[in-house]
């Protein structure tokens, strides 16, 4: 799910808590939770970054010192492996790195955005692990290609099979293309006026009389 979407974070937080697991968040999410926790008006909206049900994932830094022998490197060098805003989280009591996740995978719900899939190389998800992708369904070629790239990663780690299919569930009133076509076919409407879409060319494939809506336009029903 998007890194700044704290409402979705809350959904996974509650799911992890109710299933007896820790939610593992990344440093950007920890920073956001810290900001909200320090707000007079918003401190109760979301858990604090040091919440007992949360772990903060510390990735490899620029020099990848996190798993190196600190008798050969100083603590100061380890801190300098991370940017200034990241360093304060290195002292949090609830931090974990890839070794903790890899060793105890059943204890965690691990957040891994599309931009941090390289962390899977270290984490090494167990074959058959579950992956939940809480994002908008692709609606253009660029997004479809990106999803195929994501599938390559998860096929590589045995999380999805070679058929490259995953179960889809839609919420908040959204439907996939097959479901929308089913509604259009079943309605047998004389005219179709798509409202909440950027690509009514798909609707024009499915219905002979589609009106394209323009901003501030007036349409007779």
Predicted regions and their residues:
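Acidic/His-rich, metal-assisted hydrolase cores and their charged scaffolds
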Residues: 1-221
């Amino acid at each position: 799910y998007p890194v700044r979407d704290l409402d979705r974070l809350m959904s996974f937080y509650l799911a992890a808590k109710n299933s007896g697991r820790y939610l593992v968040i990344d440093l950007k999410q920890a920073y956001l939770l810290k900001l909200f926790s320090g707000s007079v008006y918003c401190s109760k909206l979301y858990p604090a970054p040091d919440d007992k049900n949360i772990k903060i994932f510390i990735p490899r830094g620029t020099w990848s010192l996190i798993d190196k022998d600190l008798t050969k490197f100083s603590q100061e060098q380890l801190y300098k492996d991370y940017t200034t805003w990241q360093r304060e989280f290195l002292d949090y009591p609830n931090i974990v790195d890839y070794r903790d996740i890899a060793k105890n995978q059943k204890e965690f719900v691990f957040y891994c955005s599309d931009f941090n899939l390289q962390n899977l190389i270290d984490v090494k998800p167990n074959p058959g692990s579950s992956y939940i992708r809480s994002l908008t369904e692709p609606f253009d070629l660029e997004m479809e290609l990106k999803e195929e790239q994501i599938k390559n990663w998860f096929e590589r780690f045995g999380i999805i099979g070679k058929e490259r299919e995953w179960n889809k569930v839609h919420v908040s009133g959204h439907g996939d293309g097959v479901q929308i076509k089913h509604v259009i076919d079943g309605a047998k409407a004389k005219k179709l006026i798509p409202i909440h879409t950027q690509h009514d060319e798909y609707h024009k494939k499915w219905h002979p009389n589609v009106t394209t809506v323009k901003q501030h336009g007036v349409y007779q029903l």
